[in-house]
Amino acid sequence: MKIYLVGGAVRDALLGLPVKDRDWVVVGSTPQEMLDAGYQQVGRDFPVFLHPQTHEEYALARTERKSGSGYTGFTCYAAPDVTLEDDLKRRDLTINALAQDDNGEIIDPYNGLGDLQNRLLRHVSPAFGEDPLRVLRVARFAARYAHLGFRIADETLTLMREMTHAGELEHLTPERVWKETENALTTRNPQVFFQVLRDCGALRVLFPEIDALFGVPAPARWHPEIDTGIHTLMTLSMAAMLSPQVDVRFTTLCHDLGKGLTPPELWPRHHGHGPAGVKLVEQLCQRLRVPNEIRDLARLVAEFHDLIHTFPMLNPKTIVKLFDSIDAWRKPQRVEQLALTSEADVRGRTGFESADYPQGRWLREAWEVAQSVPTKAVVEAGFKGVEIREELTRRRIAAVASWKEQRCPKPE
Protein backbone atom coordinates (compact mmCIF):
# COMPACT_ATOMS: atom_id res chain seq x y z
CA MET A 1 0.00 0.00 0.00
CA LYS A 2 1.27 3.48 -0.95
CA ILE A 3 -0.42 6.73 -0.02
CA TYR A 4 -0.11 10.02 -1.92
CA LEU A 5 -1.36 13.55 -1.34
CA VAL A 6 -3.10 14.60 -4.56
CA GLY A 7 -4.92 17.37 -6.38
CA GLY A 8 -5.73 20.78 -4.98
CA ALA A 9 -3.59 20.53 -1.86
CA VAL A 10 -0.46 19.89 -3.93
CA ARG A 11 -1.39 22.55 -6.48
CA ASP A 12 -2.12 25.31 -3.97
CA ALA A 13 0.96 24.54 -1.87
CA LEU A 14 3.13 24.91 -4.98
CA LEU A 15 1.41 28.22 -5.75
CA GLY A 16 2.04 29.45 -2.22
CA LEU A 17 -1.68 29.58 -1.45
CA PRO A 18 -3.42 28.37 1.73
CA VAL A 19 -4.32 24.68 1.63
CA LYS A 20 -7.89 24.12 2.84
CA ASP A 21 -8.66 20.46 2.21
CA ARG A 22 -6.29 17.55 1.70
CA ASP A 23 -7.24 14.55 -0.41
CA TRP A 24 -5.28 11.30 -0.59
CA VAL A 25 -5.01 8.43 -3.06
CA VAL A 26 -4.20 4.92 -1.89
CA VAL A 27 -2.44 2.66 -4.40
CA GLY A 28 -2.25 -1.13 -4.07
CA SER A 29 -4.95 -1.61 -1.45
CA THR A 30 -8.45 -3.05 -1.14
CA PRO A 31 -11.62 -1.90 0.65
CA GLN A 32 -11.24 -4.66 3.24
CA GLU A 33 -7.66 -3.68 3.97
CA MET A 34 -8.77 -0.07 4.53
CA LEU A 35 -11.59 -1.15 6.84
CA ASP A 36 -9.23 -3.39 8.79
CA ALA A 37 -6.93 -0.39 9.28
CA GLY A 38 -9.78 1.55 10.92
CA TYR A 39 -10.90 3.70 7.98
CA GLN A 40 -14.62 4.42 7.56
CA GLN A 41 -16.07 3.90 4.08
CA VAL A 42 -18.24 6.78 2.84
CA GLY A 43 -18.20 6.37 -0.95
CA ARG A 44 -21.22 4.60 -2.35
CA ASP A 45 -20.25 4.54 -6.03
CA PHE A 46 -16.49 4.17 -5.53
CA PRO A 47 -14.32 3.37 -2.51
CA VAL A 48 -13.62 6.53 -0.50
CA PHE A 49 -12.71 6.32 3.18
CA LEU A 50 -12.30 8.70 6.10
CA HIS A 51 -9.11 8.55 8.14
CA PRO A 52 -9.87 7.40 11.70
CA GLN A 53 -8.08 10.41 13.27
CA THR A 54 -7.96 13.27 10.74
CA HIS A 55 -11.24 12.40 8.95
CA GLU A 56 -9.57 13.41 5.68
CA GLU A 57 -10.65 11.56 2.53
CA TYR A 58 -8.61 8.62 1.27
CA ALA A 59 -9.70 7.15 -2.07
CA LEU A 60 -8.50 3.93 -3.62
CA ALA A 61 -6.78 4.57 -6.93
CA ARG A 62 -9.36 4.16 -9.68
CA THR A 63 -10.08 4.58 -13.35
CA GLU A 64 -13.32 5.81 -14.89
CA ARG A 65 -15.02 4.76 -18.10
CA LYS A 66 -17.85 6.64 -19.78
CA SER A 67 -21.00 4.53 -19.66
CA GLY A 68 -23.81 7.05 -20.09
CA SER A 69 -24.67 10.69 -20.73
CA GLY A 70 -23.84 13.69 -18.59
CA TYR A 71 -21.49 13.98 -15.65
CA THR A 72 -22.87 10.96 -13.73
CA GLY A 73 -22.59 8.39 -16.51
CA PHE A 74 -19.32 6.78 -15.45
CA THR A 75 -18.29 3.28 -14.42
CA CYS A 76 -15.45 3.18 -11.89
CA TYR A 77 -12.82 0.49 -11.52
CA ALA A 78 -10.80 0.38 -8.30
CA ALA A 79 -8.34 -2.45 -7.65
CA PRO A 80 -4.77 -2.96 -6.38
CA ASP A 81 -3.46 -3.02 -9.97
CA VAL A 82 -4.59 0.57 -10.72
CA THR A 83 -1.47 2.75 -10.73
CA LEU A 84 -1.06 6.31 -9.51
CA GLU A 85 -0.60 7.45 -13.12
CA ASP A 86 -3.88 5.74 -14.06
CA ASP A 87 -5.69 7.57 -11.29
CA LEU A 88 -4.18 10.96 -12.12
CA LYS A 89 -5.05 10.58 -15.80
CA ARG A 90 -8.78 10.72 -15.08
CA ARG A 91 -8.47 14.20 -13.54
CA ASP A 92 -9.56 17.34 -15.35
CA LEU A 93 -6.49 19.61 -15.52
CA THR A 94 -2.77 18.91 -15.47
CA ILE A 95 -2.31 21.23 -12.49
CA ASN A 96 -4.76 19.00 -10.60
CA ALA A 97 -3.01 15.79 -11.69
CA LEU A 98 -0.08 16.23 -9.32
CA ALA A 99 0.77 13.96 -6.39
CA GLN A 100 3.22 14.09 -3.50
CA ASP A 101 4.66 11.07 -1.72
CA ASP A 102 5.53 10.80 1.97
CA ASN A 103 9.05 12.06 1.24
CA GLY A 104 7.73 15.28 -0.25
CA GLU A 105 8.64 14.31 -3.82
CA ILE A 106 6.25 15.55 -6.52
CA ILE A 107 4.97 12.99 -9.02
CA ASP A 108 4.04 14.76 -12.26
CA PRO A 109 3.23 12.41 -15.16
CA TYR A 110 1.31 15.01 -17.22
CA ASN A 111 3.50 18.15 -16.98
CA GLY A 112 1.37 19.86 -14.36
CA LEU A 113 4.46 21.58 -12.95
CA GLY A 114 5.25 23.08 -16.34
CA ASP A 115 1.69 24.33 -16.72
CA LEU A 116 1.78 25.78 -13.21
CA GLN A 117 4.94 27.67 -14.11
CA ASN A 118 3.45 28.85 -17.41
CA ARG A 119 0.12 29.68 -15.77
CA LEU A 120 -1.85 27.38 -18.07
CA LEU A 121 -5.12 25.55 -17.46
CA ARG A 122 -4.78 22.51 -19.73
CA HIS A 123 -6.81 19.30 -19.81
CA VAL A 124 -5.05 16.03 -19.01
CA SER A 125 -6.55 13.86 -21.75
CA PRO A 126 -9.40 13.70 -24.28
CA ALA A 127 -11.48 12.08 -21.52
CA PHE A 128 -12.03 15.65 -20.30
CA GLY A 129 -14.74 15.88 -22.96
CA GLU A 130 -16.79 13.12 -21.31
CA ASP A 131 -17.79 15.27 -18.32
CA PRO A 132 -19.72 18.48 -19.13
CA LEU A 133 -19.34 19.75 -15.57
CA ARG A 134 -15.67 20.31 -16.36
CA VAL A 135 -16.57 23.23 -18.62
CA LEU A 136 -17.88 25.04 -15.54
CA ARG A 137 -14.99 23.87 -13.38
CA VAL A 138 -12.38 25.23 -15.78
CA ALA A 139 -14.25 28.54 -15.98
CA ARG A 140 -14.24 28.64 -12.18
CA PHE A 141 -10.53 27.85 -11.99
CA ALA A 142 -9.89 30.63 -14.52
CA ALA A 143 -11.73 33.04 -12.21
CA ARG A 144 -10.04 31.72 -9.09
CA TYR A 145 -6.51 32.07 -10.46
CA ALA A 146 -6.94 35.06 -12.78
CA HIS A 147 -5.03 37.29 -10.35
CA LEU A 148 -2.03 34.96 -10.76
CA GLY A 149 -2.10 35.31 -14.54
CA PHE A 150 -3.59 31.93 -15.43
CA ARG A 151 -5.23 31.44 -18.82
CA ILE A 152 -6.92 28.51 -20.54
CA ALA A 153 -4.84 26.60 -23.08
CA ASP A 154 -6.10 27.05 -26.63
CA GLU A 155 -6.69 23.34 -27.14
CA THR A 156 -8.68 23.13 -23.90
CA LEU A 157 -10.89 26.07 -24.86
CA THR A 158 -11.43 24.44 -28.25
CA LEU A 159 -12.52 21.21 -26.55
CA MET A 160 -14.88 23.17 -24.29
CA ARG A 161 -16.46 24.74 -27.38
CA GLU A 162 -16.88 21.33 -28.97
CA MET A 163 -18.55 19.99 -25.82
CA THR A 164 -20.92 22.95 -25.73
CA HIS A 165 -21.84 22.70 -29.40
CA ALA A 166 -22.44 18.94 -29.01
CA GLY A 167 -25.14 19.68 -26.42
CA GLU A 168 -23.24 18.10 -23.52
CA LEU A 169 -24.15 20.95 -21.13
CA GLU A 170 -27.83 20.12 -21.45
CA HIS A 171 -27.19 17.10 -19.21
CA LEU A 172 -26.20 19.30 -16.26
CA THR A 173 -28.75 19.64 -13.47
CA PRO A 174 -29.75 23.14 -12.34
CA GLU A 175 -28.39 22.43 -8.87
CA ARG A 176 -24.90 21.63 -10.20
CA VAL A 177 -24.86 24.70 -12.44
CA TRP A 178 -25.85 26.92 -9.53
CA LYS A 179 -23.31 25.30 -7.19
CA GLU A 180 -20.44 25.95 -9.62
CA THR A 181 -21.75 29.47 -10.23
CA GLU A 182 -22.00 30.15 -6.51
CA ASN A 183 -18.42 28.95 -6.01
CA ALA A 184 -17.23 31.11 -8.90
CA LEU A 185 -18.96 34.13 -7.38
CA THR A 186 -16.80 33.79 -4.26
CA THR A 187 -13.57 34.22 -6.25
CA ARG A 188 -11.57 37.43 -6.59
CA ASN A 189 -12.54 37.83 -10.26
CA PRO A 190 -15.99 36.27 -10.77
CA GLN A 191 -16.47 38.13 -14.05
CA VAL A 192 -13.82 35.85 -15.59
CA PHE A 193 -16.11 32.85 -15.02
CA PHE A 194 -18.84 34.35 -17.18
CA GLN A 195 -16.39 35.62 -19.80
CA VAL A 196 -14.96 32.11 -20.20
CA LEU A 197 -18.47 30.68 -20.53
CA ARG A 198 -19.14 33.21 -23.27
CA ASP A 199 -15.85 32.39 -25.00
CA CYS A 200 -16.82 28.72 -25.30
CA GLY A 201 -20.50 29.30 -26.09
CA ALA A 202 -21.76 28.04 -22.74
CA LEU A 203 -23.16 31.40 -21.59
CA ARG A 204 -25.81 31.24 -24.32
CA VAL A 205 -26.81 27.76 -23.13
CA LEU A 206 -26.76 28.25 -19.35
CA PHE A 207 -27.33 32.01 -18.94
CA PRO A 208 -29.16 33.18 -22.09
CA GLU A 209 -30.50 36.24 -20.26
CA ILE A 210 -26.94 37.46 -19.68
CA ASP A 211 -25.65 36.40 -23.07
CA ALA A 212 -28.41 38.47 -24.72
CA LEU A 213 -26.88 41.66 -23.29
CA PHE A 214 -23.74 41.44 -25.41
CA GLY A 215 -24.04 43.62 -28.49
CA VAL A 216 -26.82 45.72 -26.95
CA PRO A 217 -25.66 49.36 -26.92
CA ALA A 218 -26.24 51.96 -24.22
CA PRO A 219 -25.80 55.75 -24.59
CA ALA A 220 -22.07 56.53 -24.84
CA ARG A 221 -22.54 59.60 -22.64
CA TRP A 222 -23.40 57.41 -19.67
CA HIS A 223 -21.69 54.22 -20.80
CA PRO A 224 -18.36 54.81 -22.57
CA GLU A 225 -17.99 51.02 -22.78
CA ILE A 226 -21.29 51.09 -24.79
CA ASP A 227 -21.86 47.30 -24.82
CA THR A 228 -24.30 46.28 -22.06
CA GLY A 229 -22.73 42.83 -21.75
CA ILE A 230 -19.32 44.36 -21.13
CA HIS A 231 -20.88 46.77 -18.62
CA THR A 232 -22.50 43.84 -16.82
CA LEU A 233 -19.17 42.07 -16.33
CA MET A 234 -17.54 45.35 -15.27
CA THR A 235 -20.22 45.85 -12.61
CA LEU A 236 -19.69 42.29 -11.36
CA SER A 237 -15.96 42.97 -11.10
CA MET A 238 -16.70 46.13 -9.13
CA ALA A 239 -19.20 44.33 -6.88
CA ALA A 240 -16.49 41.80 -6.06
CA MET A 241 -14.26 44.65 -4.91
CA LEU A 242 -17.02 46.18 -2.80
CA SER A 243 -18.42 43.07 -1.11
CA PRO A 244 -17.59 39.39 -0.50
CA GLN A 245 -21.30 38.50 -0.45
CA VAL A 246 -22.56 36.17 -3.16
CA ASP A 247 -25.94 37.93 -2.81
CA VAL A 248 -24.48 41.29 -3.80
CA ARG A 249 -22.38 39.87 -6.61
CA PHE A 250 -25.12 37.78 -8.21
CA THR A 251 -27.77 40.49 -7.99
CA THR A 252 -25.36 42.99 -9.53
CA LEU A 253 -24.86 40.56 -12.40
CA CYS A 254 -28.63 40.54 -12.99
CA HIS A 255 -29.35 44.25 -12.56
CA ASP A 256 -29.62 45.15 -16.27
CA LEU A 257 -31.27 42.03 -17.70
CA GLY A 258 -34.19 44.15 -18.86
CA LYS A 259 -32.01 45.88 -21.45
CA GLY A 260 -31.94 42.63 -23.38
CA LEU A 261 -35.67 43.10 -24.04
CA THR A 262 -35.38 46.57 -25.59
CA PRO A 263 -36.37 46.51 -29.29
CA PRO A 264 -33.36 47.43 -31.47
CA GLU A 265 -35.23 50.38 -32.98
CA LEU A 266 -35.24 52.00 -29.52
CA TRP A 267 -31.50 51.53 -28.90
CA PRO A 268 -29.43 52.90 -27.26
CA ARG A 269 -32.08 54.02 -24.75
CA HIS A 270 -33.67 51.51 -22.39
CA HIS A 271 -36.56 53.27 -20.71
CA GLY A 272 -38.16 51.12 -18.01
CA HIS A 273 -35.54 48.39 -18.26
CA GLY A 274 -35.45 47.92 -14.49
CA PRO A 275 -39.03 46.74 -13.91
CA ALA A 276 -38.91 44.95 -17.29
CA GLY A 277 -35.98 42.88 -16.08
CA VAL A 278 -37.79 41.50 -13.04
CA LYS A 279 -39.44 38.69 -15.03
CA LEU A 280 -36.10 37.70 -16.56
CA VAL A 281 -34.56 37.60 -13.08
CA GLU A 282 -37.37 35.33 -11.91
CA GLN A 283 -36.97 33.13 -14.99
CA LEU A 284 -33.22 32.72 -14.51
CA CYS A 285 -33.49 32.09 -10.78
CA GLN A 286 -36.29 29.57 -11.14
CA ARG A 287 -34.40 27.65 -13.83
CA LEU A 288 -31.20 27.40 -11.77
CA ARG A 289 -32.94 26.87 -8.41
CA VAL A 290 -31.31 29.99 -7.00
CA PRO A 291 -32.04 30.37 -3.25
CA ASN A 292 -35.17 32.42 -2.59
CA GLU A 293 -33.40 35.11 -0.57
CA ILE A 294 -30.96 35.81 -3.40
CA ARG A 295 -33.77 35.70 -5.98
CA ASP A 296 -35.85 38.21 -4.04
CA LEU A 297 -32.91 40.58 -3.67
CA ALA A 298 -32.11 40.28 -7.39
CA ARG A 299 -35.68 41.26 -8.25
CA LEU A 300 -35.48 44.33 -6.03
CA VAL A 301 -32.09 45.38 -7.41
CA ALA A 302 -33.34 45.07 -10.99
CA GLU A 303 -36.42 47.14 -10.18
CA PHE A 304 -34.93 49.87 -8.01
CA HIS A 305 -31.23 50.38 -8.89
CA ASP A 306 -31.96 53.32 -11.19
CA LEU A 307 -34.11 54.92 -8.50
CA ILE A 308 -31.13 55.04 -6.13
CA HIS A 309 -29.09 56.90 -8.76
CA THR A 310 -31.66 59.73 -8.64
CA PHE A 311 -31.76 59.89 -4.83
CA PRO A 312 -31.51 63.72 -4.50
CA MET A 313 -34.65 64.04 -6.65
CA LEU A 314 -36.71 61.64 -4.55
CA ASN A 315 -39.24 63.16 -2.18
CA PRO A 316 -39.34 61.88 1.43
CA LYS A 317 -42.55 59.94 0.83
CA THR A 318 -40.95 58.04 -2.06
CA ILE A 319 -37.89 57.26 0.05
CA VAL A 320 -39.97 55.77 2.86
CA LYS A 321 -42.06 53.88 0.30
CA LEU A 322 -38.81 52.44 -1.09
CA PHE A 323 -37.95 51.09 2.35
CA ASP A 324 -41.44 49.55 2.47
CA SER A 325 -41.01 48.02 -0.99
CA ILE A 326 -37.75 46.28 -0.12
CA ASP A 327 -39.12 45.14 3.27
CA ALA A 328 -36.26 46.94 5.00
CA TRP A 329 -38.04 47.01 8.36
CA ARG A 330 -37.77 43.22 8.58
CA LYS A 331 -34.66 42.81 6.41
CA PRO A 332 -32.50 45.87 7.08
CA GLN A 333 -29.46 44.30 5.35
CA ARG A 334 -31.18 44.97 2.04
CA VAL A 335 -30.49 48.69 2.36
CA GLU A 336 -26.75 48.08 2.41
CA GLN A 337 -27.02 45.51 -0.37
CA LEU A 338 -28.98 47.91 -2.57
CA ALA A 339 -26.45 50.67 -1.89
CA LEU A 340 -23.56 48.39 -2.89
CA THR A 341 -25.17 47.05 -6.06
CA SER A 342 -26.11 50.55 -7.18
CA GLU A 343 -22.56 51.75 -6.54
CA ALA A 344 -21.19 48.81 -8.53
CA ASP A 345 -23.49 49.80 -11.39
CA VAL A 346 -22.18 53.37 -11.49
CA ARG A 347 -18.51 52.47 -11.05
CA GLY A 348 -18.67 49.51 -13.44
CA ARG A 349 -18.19 51.82 -16.42
CA THR A 350 -15.12 52.78 -18.41
CA GLY A 351 -13.53 55.80 -16.76
CA PHE A 352 -15.79 55.73 -13.70
CA GLU A 353 -14.03 52.98 -11.75
CA SER A 354 -12.89 55.38 -9.00
CA ALA A 355 -15.99 57.58 -9.00
CA ASP A 356 -17.59 58.66 -5.75
CA TYR A 357 -21.13 57.45 -5.16
CA PRO A 358 -22.77 59.76 -2.60
CA GLN A 359 -26.21 58.29 -3.33
CA GLY A 360 -25.17 55.20 -1.40
CA ARG A 361 -24.29 57.30 1.64
CA TRP A 362 -27.54 59.22 1.43
CA LEU A 363 -29.55 56.01 1.18
CA ARG A 364 -27.85 54.65 4.30
CA GLU A 365 -28.32 57.92 6.21
CA ALA A 366 -32.00 58.19 5.25
CA TRP A 367 -32.50 54.62 6.43
CA GLU A 368 -30.89 55.35 9.80
CA VAL A 369 -33.20 58.33 10.21
CA ALA A 370 -36.34 56.45 9.18
CA GLN A 371 -35.72 53.41 11.35
CA SER A 372 -34.88 55.53 14.39
CA VAL A 373 -38.49 56.73 14.62
CA PRO A 374 -39.80 54.81 17.67
CA THR A 375 -42.92 52.68 17.28
CA LYS A 376 -43.40 52.78 21.04
CA ALA A 377 -44.00 56.54 20.99
CA VAL A 378 -46.78 56.10 18.44
CA VAL A 379 -48.52 53.48 20.57
CA GLU A 380 -48.13 55.59 23.71
CA ALA A 381 -49.71 58.51 21.87
CA GLY A 382 -52.94 56.50 21.73
CA PHE A 383 -52.97 55.30 18.13
CA LYS A 384 -54.53 51.88 17.62
CA GLY A 385 -54.79 49.22 14.89
CA VAL A 386 -54.11 50.42 11.38
CA GLU A 387 -53.65 53.96 12.71
CA ILE A 388 -50.32 52.91 14.24
CA ARG A 389 -48.82 52.07 10.86
CA GLU A 390 -50.24 55.19 9.23
CA GLU A 391 -48.89 57.48 11.94
CA LEU A 392 -45.54 55.69 12.00
CA THR A 393 -45.24 56.21 8.25
CA ARG A 394 -46.17 59.89 8.60
CA ARG A 395 -43.51 60.39 11.28
CA ARG A 396 -40.91 58.56 9.23
CA ILE A 397 -41.63 60.76 6.23
CA ALA A 398 -41.35 63.87 8.40
CA ALA A 399 -38.04 62.69 9.86
CA VAL A 400 -36.61 61.93 6.41
CA ALA A 401 -37.85 65.31 5.13
CA SER A 402 -36.02 67.09 7.95
CA TRP A 403 -32.85 65.10 7.30
CA LYS A 404 -33.05 65.67 3.54
CA GLU A 405 -33.37 69.42 4.02
CA GLN A 406 -30.15 69.50 6.03
CA ARG A 407 -27.99 66.73 4.58
CA CYS A 408 -28.99 65.90 1.02
CA PRO A 409 -28.20 68.41 -1.75
CA LYS A 410 -31.14 69.76 -3.70
CA PRO A 411 -31.34 68.61 -7.33
CA GLU A 412 -30.26 71.16 -9.90
From Swiss-Prot:
Cofactor note as given: Magnesium is required for nucleotidyltransferase activity. Nickel for phosphatase activity.
Record flagged with keyword Metal-binding: yes
Binding site for ATP: 8, 11, 91, 137, 140
Covalent S-S links between cysteines: none
SUPFAM superfamilies: Nucleotidyltransferase, Poly A polymerase C-terminal region-like
GO BP field: RNA repair; tRNA 3'-terminal CCA addition
Taxonomic superkingdom: Bacteria
Reaction catalysed by this enzyme: a tRNA precursor + 2 CTP + ATP = a tRNA with a 3' CCA end + 3 diphosphate; a tRNA with a 3' CCA end + 2 CTP + ATP = a tRNA with a 3' CCACCA end + 3 diphosphate
Keyword field contains Transferase: yes
A molecular function (GO) term: CCA tRNA nucleotidyltransferase activity
Alphabetical list of CDD domains matching this protein: HDc, NT_ClassII-CCAase
Keywords in alphabetical order: ATP-binding, Hydrolase, Magnesium, Metal-binding, Multifunctional enzyme, Nickel, Nucleotide-binding, Nucleotidyltransferase, RNA repair, RNA-binding, Transferase, tRNA processing
Gene3D superfamilies: Beta Polymerase, domain 2, cca-adding enzyme, domain 2
Coiled coil: none
Pfam family, one: HD
InterPro entries linked: CCA_bact, HD/PDEase_dom, HD_domain, NT_sf, PolA_pol_head_dom, PolyA_RNA-bd, tRNA_CCA-adding_enzyme
Residues annotated to bind CTP: 8, 11, 91, 137, 140
Chain ranges of the HD domain: 228-329
Entry's EC annotation: 2.7.7.72, 3.1.3.-, 3.1.4.-
Stated role: Catalyzes the addition and repair of the essential 3'-terminal CCA sequence in tRNAs without using a nucleic acid template. Adds these three nucleotides in the order of C, C, and A to the tRNA nucleotide-73, using CTP and ATP as substrates and producing inorganic pyrophosphate. tRNA 3'-terminal CCA addition is required both for tRNA processing and repair. Also involved in tRNA surveillance by mediating tandem CCA addition to generate a CCACCA at the 3' terminus of unstable tRNAs. While stable tRNAs receive only 3'-terminal CCA, unstable tRNAs are marked with CCACCA and rapidly degraded.
Assigned protein family: Belongs to the tRNA nucleotidyltransferase/poly(A) polymerase family. Bacterial CCA-adding enzyme type 1 subfamily.
Quaternary context: Monomer. Can also form homodimers and oligomers.
Domain notes for this protein: Comprises two domains: an N-terminal domain containing the nucleotidyltransferase activity and a C-terminal HD domain associated with both phosphodiesterase and phosphatase activities.
This protein's name: Multifunctional CCA protein
Source organism of this protein record: Escherichia coli O157:H7
